[in-house]
């Protein structure tokens, strides 16, 4: 997938990293919000072809028109044919752009599915499937941030949900739980990603964090066994908090624990979220946090609701 759509979002979020949020006035927040919203819609509803939606190659040529008169294109790399809406949010969609915008903002506001369906003017079933389509696109759009300086690393757990699976309500951390690997640095940048059922393995953690944590950083975590191989692979300083302790040499896991609270608060109003869709919900959580942080709930309601 093309990466050009992420540039404006990255530039805008860097502003949030370099200044204190309280120092922004209302006009600055609205301008920053408009920039990020415009970048999102540029990706979601873009009709200008810059690369192949299948392989990302920029070597594309026009290849006639389809039966509806829409321009077709051919990729010289993978030889596949496509139109300007292929693999985009509007592909095979029965919703108008205005309806997608309402669904987008309602999802960012973490509205219940019934409220979203009422606002968009569709059934609850349609709202469900289109919200998942939106979350899939957001997960493809979002970039992993590079974490640096002091980084708190820990995992939290949600109940595992799958079709035909009966929860046994076992005590402790078992296969009835799905792990979410979380890492957050002192600047507030964070990475959240679904891991394994039960405790995450070292190979899973390496896959998630190997290109995320910058060299020279300090990682703070508990003494879980799977972290040992991760730290060996990253080759960085590791502050290991002993089991039963809350801190070591002034280092704590307070930052990542607060992130866990925010994740669980986001899922609190959502019952029986299927694990298959969990990563999409985590992408929606990150966009929702950015949206709420910039313009606040009252400003959101005044402008959009």
Sequence positions of predicted segments:
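Residue-level recognition of single "structural anchor" positions
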Residues: 1-305
